[in-house]
């Protein structure tokens, strides 16, 4: 049986029963009877409700490498969950069937719990399932964890009491106040930095690049372990100059120890007419990252590529040999390179 909708966190009442949602950096002004840009936060009579609390559309046990998080408990499993909805509207979204779900709502037609796609999965159940499958972490992923923040926040608190880590796979559009509130329970995040082109962010995503950069810097200052992913879309964010700007930002603002995952685009959603990213561009981007001084630069969606492996930044030997999400060798012992003793950056590198 569906539960009543839960009151949302982070909003401010305004005139005429309107509200301003302060969860993400859009800071939507939501009139009575309307939804935010994420499509899952509804203003009912001046009270902001989350429509997706404990309503899960996807739940799987994944290798942590799939997030991708290569420096968080390598080889472990992560119980991964999502609700419908997203505060971005990327033309190239690979999960558009669940992220871009349209929920009907108006002042005359209030949404009902039965309308919301997904199955009821309580906070207690998500932690219990993670334990049953010996998962070292719970990943809030697939769509955008920001828009099911209340669920992630409550599950995250409980997970920590059971010695389970919490990780976000996020577009990095949380407000500073939302990030600071969840910081005690958020151990790591893979953040999509979709390029360094403000025009690309505005036209193809509907967001502001500068806001994402501010979030990344704040996460770093809060002590959250960060890995960055850039999906390279031909003709949009594949220029060498833009890639150098991404690499330099990571190096200068997040640190040389921040992993950068460079991912190959395949046609999807509203960009079916765009060709897959040429492999040489992915490899060139990795080269740029290494030249900039980043220690760990990875190629994504290229199974078998040498860029899948983790190399020691000191002796250059392969520390973790991968094929796709599978670990074939691991030469990190007690957080150090087995060959030269260099300290390798990350969480749970045993």
Question: Where are the predicted features?
Answer:
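Core alpha-helical elements of the protein kinase catalytic domain
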Residues: 22, 84, 88-91, 157, ...
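Extended interfacial segments that mediate partner engagement and assembly in macromolecular machines
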Residues: 46-153
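Auxiliary Fe-S-binding modules of radical SAM enzymes
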Residues: 1-32, 235-350
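Conserved AdoMet/S-adenosylmethionine-binding subsite of the radical SAM
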Residues: 118-280
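Hydrophobic packing within well-folded, soluble alpha/beta domains
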Residues: 90-93, 168, 228, 337
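A generic "binding-loop/recognition-motif" signal
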Residues: 34, 86, 197
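N-terminal [4Fe-4S]-dependent radical SAM core
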Residues: 1-21, 25-83, 96-100, 308, ...
């Amino acid at each position: 049986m569906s539960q009543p909708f839960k009151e949302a966190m982070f909003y401010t009442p305004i005139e005429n029963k309107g509200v301003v949602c302060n969860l993400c950096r859009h800071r939507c002004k939501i009139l009575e009877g309307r939804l935010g840009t994420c499509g899952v936060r509804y203003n009912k009579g001046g009270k902001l409700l989350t429509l997706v609390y404990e309503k899960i559309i996807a739940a799987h046990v994944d290798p942590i490498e799939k997030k991708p998080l290569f420096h968080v408990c390598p080889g472990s499993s992560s119980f991964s969950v999502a609700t419908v909805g997203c505060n971005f509207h990327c033309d190239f979204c690979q999960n558009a069937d669940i992220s871009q779900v349209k929920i009907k709502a108006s002042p005359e037609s209030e949404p009902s719990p039965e309308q919301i796609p997904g199955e009821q999965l309580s906070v207690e159940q998500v932690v219990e399932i993670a334990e049953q499958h010996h998962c070292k972490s719970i990943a809030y992923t697939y769509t955008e964890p920001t828009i099911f923040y209340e669920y992630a926040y409550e599950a995250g608190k409980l997970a920590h009491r059971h010695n389970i880590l919490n990780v976000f796979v996020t577009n990095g559009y949380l407000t500073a106040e939302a990030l600071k509130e969840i910081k005690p329970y958020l151990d790591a995040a893979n953040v999509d930095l979709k390029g360094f082109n403000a025009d690309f962010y505005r036209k193809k995503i509907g967001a502001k690049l500068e806001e994402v950069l501010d979030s990344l810097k704040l996460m770093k200052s809060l002590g959250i372990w960060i890995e960055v992913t850039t999906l390279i879309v031909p003709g949009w964010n594949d220029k060498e100059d833009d890639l150098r700007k991404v690499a330099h930002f990571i190096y200068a603002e997040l640190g040389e120890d921040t992993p950068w995952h460079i991912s190959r685009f395949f046609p999807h959603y509203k960009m079916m007419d765009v060709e897959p990213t040429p492999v040489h561009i992915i490899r060139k981007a990795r080269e740029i990252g290494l030249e900039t001084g980043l220690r760990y630069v990875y190629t994504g969606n290229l199974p078998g590529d040498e860029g899948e492996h983790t190399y020691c930044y000191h002796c250059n030997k392969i520390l973790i040999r991968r094929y796709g999400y599978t670990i074939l060798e691991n030469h990190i012992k007690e957080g150090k390179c087995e060959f030269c003793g260099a300290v390798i950056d990350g969480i749970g590198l045993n």
